[in-house]
Amino acid sequence: MGRSAGFILWLTGLSGAGKSTLSRALRAHLASSMPVEVLDGDEVRTWLSRGLGFTREDREENVRRIGHVARLLAKHGVGVIAAAISPYASSRAEVRRLAEEAGIPFVEIYVQAPLDVLIARDVKGLYKKALAGELAHFTGVSDPYEAPDAPDVTVHSDVDTVEAGLWRVLETLRKRGLLDAAAAA
Protein backbone atom coordinates (compact mmCIF):
# COMPACT_ATOMS: atom_id res chain seq x y z
CA MET A 1 0.00 0.00 0.00
CA GLY A 2 1.22 3.52 -0.75
CA ARG A 3 2.01 6.21 1.72
CA SER A 4 -1.02 7.72 3.48
CA ALA A 5 0.28 11.29 3.50
CA GLY A 6 -0.28 13.43 0.45
CA PHE A 7 2.19 15.21 -1.77
CA ILE A 8 2.22 17.63 -4.67
CA LEU A 9 3.66 16.80 -8.08
CA TRP A 10 3.94 20.11 -9.95
CA LEU A 11 4.29 19.64 -13.72
CA THR A 12 5.47 22.77 -15.49
CA GLY A 13 6.34 23.38 -19.13
CA LEU A 14 5.13 25.10 -22.27
CA SER A 15 1.80 24.42 -23.96
CA GLY A 16 1.95 21.09 -25.76
CA ALA A 17 4.97 19.78 -23.85
CA GLY A 18 3.03 16.80 -22.49
CA LYS A 19 2.05 17.86 -18.97
CA SER A 20 -1.54 16.60 -19.28
CA THR A 21 -0.45 13.35 -20.91
CA LEU A 22 2.07 12.63 -18.16
CA SER A 23 -0.41 13.65 -15.45
CA ARG A 24 -2.96 11.13 -16.78
CA ALA A 25 -0.32 8.38 -16.74
CA LEU A 26 0.69 9.30 -13.19
CA ARG A 27 -2.93 9.32 -12.02
CA ALA A 28 -3.59 5.91 -13.61
CA HIS A 29 -0.53 4.43 -11.91
CA LEU A 30 -0.88 6.03 -8.48
CA ALA A 31 -4.66 5.65 -8.10
CA SER A 32 -4.34 1.97 -7.18
CA SER A 33 -2.36 2.82 -4.05
CA MET A 34 -3.71 6.17 -2.86
CA PRO A 35 -6.31 8.86 -3.55
CA VAL A 36 -5.12 11.04 -6.43
CA GLU A 37 -6.43 14.26 -7.97
CA VAL A 38 -5.24 16.04 -11.09
CA LEU A 39 -5.44 19.82 -11.25
CA ASP A 40 -5.10 20.46 -14.98
CA GLY A 41 -4.31 24.02 -15.99
CA ASP A 42 -6.97 24.16 -18.72
CA GLU A 43 -9.68 22.84 -16.40
CA VAL A 44 -8.65 25.15 -13.57
CA ARG A 45 -8.89 28.12 -15.93
CA THR A 46 -12.42 27.05 -16.86
CA TRP A 47 -13.72 26.51 -13.32
CA LEU A 48 -11.51 27.96 -10.59
CA SER A 49 -9.82 30.83 -12.39
CA ARG A 50 -12.56 31.94 -14.76
CA GLY A 51 -12.28 35.66 -15.25
CA LEU A 52 -8.52 35.79 -14.97
CA GLY A 53 -6.66 37.01 -18.02
CA PHE A 54 -3.10 36.40 -19.10
CA THR A 55 -1.28 39.32 -17.52
CA ARG A 56 1.62 38.42 -15.26
CA GLU A 57 -0.52 39.21 -12.21
CA ASP A 58 -3.38 37.00 -13.43
CA ARG A 59 -1.02 34.13 -14.23
CA GLU A 60 0.53 34.42 -10.76
CA GLU A 61 -2.94 34.43 -9.19
CA ASN A 62 -3.87 31.33 -11.18
CA VAL A 63 -0.78 29.52 -9.87
CA ARG A 64 -1.57 30.66 -6.30
CA ARG A 65 -5.09 29.24 -6.61
CA ILE A 66 -3.86 25.92 -7.95
CA GLY A 67 -1.25 25.80 -5.19
CA HIS A 68 -3.85 26.52 -2.50
CA VAL A 69 -6.18 23.76 -3.68
CA ALA A 70 -3.22 21.39 -4.03
CA ARG A 71 -2.14 22.07 -0.43
CA LEU A 72 -5.66 21.50 0.90
CA LEU A 73 -5.95 18.17 -0.89
CA ALA A 74 -2.44 17.00 0.01
CA LYS A 75 -3.00 17.92 3.65
CA HIS A 76 -5.77 15.32 3.64
CA GLY A 77 -3.69 12.52 2.17
CA VAL A 78 -4.31 13.06 -1.53
CA GLY A 79 -1.54 12.74 -4.07
CA VAL A 80 -1.98 15.92 -6.11
CA ILE A 81 -0.77 16.22 -9.68
CA ALA A 82 -0.85 19.86 -10.79
CA ALA A 83 -0.25 20.25 -14.52
CA ALA A 84 -0.04 23.93 -15.41
CA ILE A 85 2.30 26.03 -17.52
CA SER A 86 3.10 28.16 -14.43
CA PRO A 87 5.57 30.31 -16.37
CA TYR A 88 7.23 32.25 -13.56
CA ALA A 89 9.94 30.78 -11.34
CA SER A 90 8.93 33.03 -8.44
CA SER A 91 5.34 31.71 -8.47
CA ARG A 92 6.49 28.10 -8.52
CA ALA A 93 8.96 28.81 -5.71
CA GLU A 94 6.19 30.37 -3.63
CA VAL A 95 3.92 27.35 -4.11
CA ARG A 96 6.79 25.05 -3.12
CA ARG A 97 7.64 27.17 -0.06
CA LEU A 98 4.05 27.18 1.19
CA ALA A 99 3.68 23.43 0.65
CA GLU A 100 6.92 22.61 2.42
CA GLU A 101 6.11 24.98 5.30
CA ALA A 102 2.92 22.94 5.75
CA GLY A 103 5.00 19.73 5.76
CA ILE A 104 3.78 18.67 2.32
CA PRO A 105 6.37 17.12 0.00
CA PHE A 106 6.64 19.00 -3.30
CA VAL A 107 8.18 17.61 -6.49
CA GLU A 108 8.74 19.95 -9.43
CA ILE A 109 8.62 18.15 -12.78
CA TYR A 110 9.77 20.04 -15.85
CA VAL A 111 8.16 18.65 -19.00
CA GLN A 112 10.22 19.99 -21.88
CA ALA A 113 10.23 19.84 -25.68
CA PRO A 114 11.81 22.10 -28.34
CA LEU A 115 9.65 24.80 -29.92
CA ASP A 116 9.54 23.07 -33.32
CA VAL A 117 8.10 19.94 -31.67
CA LEU A 118 5.52 22.01 -29.77
CA ILE A 119 4.46 23.72 -33.00
CA ALA A 120 4.11 20.35 -34.75
CA ARG A 121 1.95 19.02 -31.87
CA ASP A 122 -0.27 22.12 -31.75
CA VAL A 123 -3.61 20.97 -33.17
CA LYS A 124 -5.31 24.28 -32.25
CA GLY A 125 -2.76 26.34 -34.17
CA LEU A 126 -2.04 28.59 -31.19
CA TYR A 127 1.72 28.70 -31.75
CA LYS A 128 1.20 29.60 -35.41
CA LYS A 129 -1.16 32.44 -34.41
CA ALA A 130 1.22 33.66 -31.70
CA LEU A 131 4.22 33.60 -34.03
CA ALA A 132 2.19 35.57 -36.61
CA GLY A 133 1.33 38.19 -33.97
CA GLU A 134 -2.36 37.24 -33.99
CA LEU A 135 -2.39 35.96 -30.41
CA ALA A 136 -1.05 38.15 -27.61
CA HIS A 137 0.34 36.95 -24.27
CA PHE A 138 1.23 33.46 -25.47
CA THR A 139 3.76 31.87 -23.15
CA GLY A 140 6.99 30.93 -24.84
CA VAL A 141 6.38 33.22 -27.82
CA SER A 142 5.18 36.69 -26.79
CA ASP A 143 5.30 36.13 -23.02
CA PRO A 144 8.22 34.64 -21.11
CA TYR A 145 8.54 31.14 -19.73
CA GLU A 146 11.14 30.84 -17.00
CA ALA A 147 12.40 27.27 -17.16
CA PRO A 148 13.22 25.71 -13.79
CA ASP A 149 16.90 25.96 -12.85
CA ALA A 150 16.90 22.78 -10.78
CA PRO A 151 13.69 20.77 -11.17
CA ASP A 152 13.38 17.55 -9.19
CA VAL A 153 12.63 15.68 -12.42
CA THR A 154 13.02 16.63 -16.09
CA VAL A 155 11.10 14.80 -18.80
CA HIS A 156 12.15 15.49 -22.40
CA SER A 157 8.86 14.63 -24.08
CA ASP A 158 10.36 14.86 -27.56
CA VAL A 159 12.59 11.85 -26.85
CA ASP A 160 11.18 10.22 -23.70
CA THR A 161 8.15 7.97 -24.01
CA VAL A 162 5.29 8.58 -21.60
CA GLU A 163 6.32 5.37 -19.83
CA ALA A 164 9.92 6.59 -19.46
CA GLY A 165 8.71 9.89 -18.01
CA LEU A 166 6.35 8.05 -15.69
CA TRP A 167 9.17 5.77 -14.50
CA ARG A 168 11.47 8.75 -13.87
CA VAL A 169 8.84 10.43 -11.68
CA LEU A 170 7.96 7.22 -9.81
CA GLU A 171 11.63 6.51 -9.13
CA THR A 172 12.03 10.02 -7.68
CA LEU A 173 8.98 9.49 -5.46
CA ARG A 174 10.33 6.15 -4.28
CA LYS A 175 13.77 7.61 -3.50
CA ARG A 176 12.16 10.38 -1.48
CA GLY A 177 10.11 7.86 0.49
CA LEU A 178 6.82 9.04 -0.95
CA LEU A 179 5.90 5.61 -2.35
CA ASP A 180 6.64 2.11 -1.27
CA ALA A 181 8.32 -0.28 -3.70
CA ALA A 182 5.02 -1.90 -4.75
CA ALA A 183 3.46 1.43 -5.76
CA ALA A 184 6.62 2.46 -7.62
CA ALA A 185 6.68 -0.74 -9.72
Swiss-Prot record:
InterPro entries: APS_kinase (IPR002891), P-loop_NTPase (IPR027417), Sulf_AdTrans/APS_kinase (IPR050512). ATP binds at G13, L14, S15, G16, A17, G18, K19, S20. GO terms for molecular function: adenylylsulfate kinase activity; ATP binding; sulfate adenylyltransferase (ATP) activity. Keywords: ATP-binding, Kinase, Nucleotide-binding, Phosphoprotein, Transferase. Its EC number is 2.7.1.25. One of its GO terms (biological process) is hydrogen sulfide biosynthetic process. CDD domains: APSK. The active site is at S86 (phosphoserine intermediate). It catalyses: adenosine 5'-phosphosulfate + ATP = 3'-phosphoadenylyl sulfate + ADP + H(+). The keyword Nucleotide-binding applies. PANTHER family: SULFATE ADENYLYLTRANSFERASE. Belongs to the APS kinase family. Catalyzes the synthesis of activated sulfate. This is Adenylyl-sulfate kinase. The gene is cysC.
